[in-house]
Amino acid sequence: MATTSRRPVLTRTKVLVPVLLVIVLAITIIAIFTRLYTDLLFYRSIDFSRVFTTVLYTRILLFVLFGVVMAIIVGTNIVLAYRLRPPLRPLSTEQQNLERYRSVIEPYMLLILLAVTTLFGLAAGLSAAGQWRTWLLWVNGESFGTPDLQFHRDISYYAFSYPFQRFLLGFLLTAVLLSLLVTLLTHYLFGGIRMQTTGERVTPAAKAHISVLLGLLALLKAWAYYLDRFGSVFSSRGVGTGASYTDVHAVLPAKLILLFISLACAVLFIYNIFQRGWTLPLLGAGILVLSSVVIGGIYPAIVQQFQVRPNEATREEPYIARNIAATRAAYGIQDVEPQDYAASTDVTAQQVAADTGTVPNIRLLDPSKLSRTFQQLQQFRGYYGFPPTLDVDRYTVTGADKKSTTQDYVVSVRELNQAGLGTQQRNWINEHLTYTHGKGFVAAPSNTVDVGRPDFDHGVSGFPQDGTFGIKENRVYFGEMSPSYSIVGTRQMEIDGPGPGETQVTTTYQGDGGVSIGSTFRRALFALRFGEKNILLSGDITKNSRILDERNPRDRVSKAAPWLTLDGDPYPAIVNGRVTWILDGYTTSDGYPYSARRTLGDVTADSVTTQSGNRTRQASNQVNYIRNSVKATVDAYNGTVTLYAWDESDPVLRTWMKAFPDTVKPKSDIPPSLRAHLRYPEDLFKVQRDLIGQYHISNPRDFYSQEDFWDVSDSPDGSGQPQPPFYVYSQLPGRKDPSYNLTSPLISARSSKLAAYMAVSSDPANYGRFTLLKLPAGNTINGPVQVQNAIEGNGDVAKQLSLWRSGGATTIEGNLLTLPLAGGLLYVEPYYVQARGSTGYPTLQGVATAFGDRIGFGASLGEALDKVFGAGAGAAAAGAGIGATTTDAGQDGTPAPRSGQGGAGVPPPGQTALQDAVGDADRAYQAGQDALRKSPPDFTAYGKAQSELADALGRLRTLSSPAATPPAATATRAGASVPASPVPASPAAKPPAPSPSATVAGGDTPGPPGARAAPAPG
């Protein structure tokens, strides 16, 4: 009865289990198909489908090839062990116990065989599929044309072939070890190995089988010793990377001896098939183990201790020389040579004033500190936003005097920020169909402020009107802050920015970016991919609708070129009238002989990357070769990805171009409008900066002493992270004109004193040209951290900081720039002040300068320079000519104002109303400062001064708007006497809101309510 009652349960179980398995299998297949097909559609949309198919086919090939081989090897040994089982087994307690297992297993032997081989095959296949990069490099490897100095093999062997051989060795060792494991288990289970039987414990058949597998292991070990010899070029035993004296004279001979011992062991294992017992193979294995300890370990240690250590500098000298040469070549710093720089501290005011290549261009706006300022002044609507860290780029603009001027700009794009939507606005239609894009390219000269604020009137706001930037399409559908996906071309109109009053301008996407989802099939697939049923069910989606995904520029390029390591900082630029994201792509390798290894994530980390949400930190991958081989662009409107070869001589790039043909365009295809905005990449510079700290030394003896090693200074902000490099437009010693440089100071590894100054040009004519200024040994010039301490310990600075903070405001130190100036080195640091409350934002309130042991602090750069060098030193900073290449010096050496502009803070003749407004602003500011200086501060008087200042600023904006004739300059140039922006002491004292004319910034020109906006300029 009990048996009968269980039958329905067993029957249901037999039916239910297969059904569940079929359901799970179906779901898995659908999920895989959905992912693959939607990925294919994405790759087709960016014209990189060949990348998708090449990677997919390669992974499938490796999965099948190595999975099947593993399954065959393991399965063959299981079958062989089963077939070699003895027909009769001696009676024993052990065998009686095993018989119970055999009776259960044997009926299902085929299923067990399939299960075991499938499991091992899947594991091996999945592991091998992840090695698609190793496979493609091995198959397509191009020659470096340079042999290594130890074995005289082309470096391509180490970069492309050696890694695959190591992978293949590991695979075969795993296969043989797994085979040995299942063989021993099978022989034991079926009586081929008997542990508790007197007499013969291993049958001859089992012995032969096991001996063959052990012989194969010995052969593979011999191959491992062979490869180990070539691996010595990556040894870290010596002073530098690569084969050292001990490696060459002890380890390499030891590896050769061990190789032959392994071959002898393999022969003994095979010979043991015909012998009784295990004496010979065990003896051989013992000799191999003992030899590996004595010859492979103890002997090299003795050589190192008694031959090398007493005379290490002499013994290691030729190998250190190899390391220096290889490292400099592998990291592209072989042509960087230090040049002596006296770094004089005896400089006159006249010399400083005469330096019109650097002083007028000194950057006062810190892109890592002013995101909130851009947000408050240029956001316009809550659903727009700016990334935490802005960018720096240079533009050549033509002034009213028809002269072209190149200068730095702090730039960003006004991106869509859906976090700014209200609670009632958060629904699927708004988030994915209506609020789809950002709008506007925002820029401000980095050396200019407008009463403490970025000078947008002389940045992007004026350019849509005069066409200087030539912006034709300013909508941003692909950006760093874009949502995961948006659907465009629907029946819903897209919000396109503010219109008159509280109205909104609308538009419909007209581009060809993204994937068409007009068909029900595609909508269903994307609904599955994003887990959103509305994609399938929404009636707003039409046959013309497109879905935009993978919208972060870095993610798009990573998809198009998965073989590239991308720089952590994409930056926007105007290229051919369109907002374009520019990214730098690196080809890397860890297979360059004798080259020092670095961990990318460590050497590229600094105080900005560790705190910024839009700067991607590099992965912790070790490399010993890197090239900036690719420049990539992403169109912000249609998402088009374009790859350009930048270093066409790079063999790693040529290898990848062979693996993925027609995906990288030649360097000659780079348009001039793009080339003008290409810059030397930060992450590469940081890697090279770290290495130059040691490898600027070419003499092996000096390198060994480490006496002249340099380090990257800690950031002066107290974060404990390295100081980031800075892009500056400056004139380097020995150069005729200023250039756009990426710069960094270096300090002595043994002290905090400044040791060197490193810069590399980004100008097209001198791109990649390094300048390395080496300061005299024993100099007393402070490093950045010491200078920061000296500035804040200065009495005048401390007093002013205390005054600002007493009103409840926060002081923010900007980037501490180090600049060669008049034969010395000048430090410049802007100071920003931010009021309390949600409306507060940083405004420039002062500038600190340091030269030698002298500190200057003032409301402007010119004032700070005058305090350090004497009266007249800040004349160049006070001039209106930004970019010394276009300014004409007056008789007193001060650059003459540009046509249509007076000097900074000085209105052009005839502009009486403007002069009055500037004067009123100055008086209101001073009144506010006087009110704050009282003890306690007079906030009533301060509020009144704020109102008067707001009124004066309003008149300034009105007079300098396009409707005013003639236009007048309202900006305070670097070093001007117009006061910096006052800071509200309480939330009630808010800064004046941007005037309506400011909405032109970035092309947000107001339009009629509900109008469909055509692509607007700017």
UniProtKB/Swiss-Prot annotation:
Which residue stretches belong to region Disordered? 886-920, 960-1018
UniProt cross-references to Pfam families, sorted A to Z = UPF0182 (PF03699)
Ranges of biased composition (kind: Low complexity)? 886-896, 960-980
Biased composition range(s): Pro residues = 981-995
Cell location: Cell membrane
The membrane spanning regions, by residue number, are 13-33, 60-80, 109-129, 167-187, 208-228, 250-270, 283-303
**Topology term for the membrane:** Multi-pass membrane protein
List the record's Gene Ontology CC terms alphabetically: extracellular region; plasma membrane
The UniProt entry lists the main location of this chain as membrane
Question: What is the protein named?
Answer: UPF0182 protein Francci3_3781
Top-rank taxon of the source lineage equals Bacteria
Keyword Cell cycle in the entry? The reply is no
**What's in the keyword line of the UniProt record?**
Cell membrane, Membrane, Transmembrane, Transmembrane helix
Q: Which family does it belong to?
A: Belongs to the UPF0182 family.
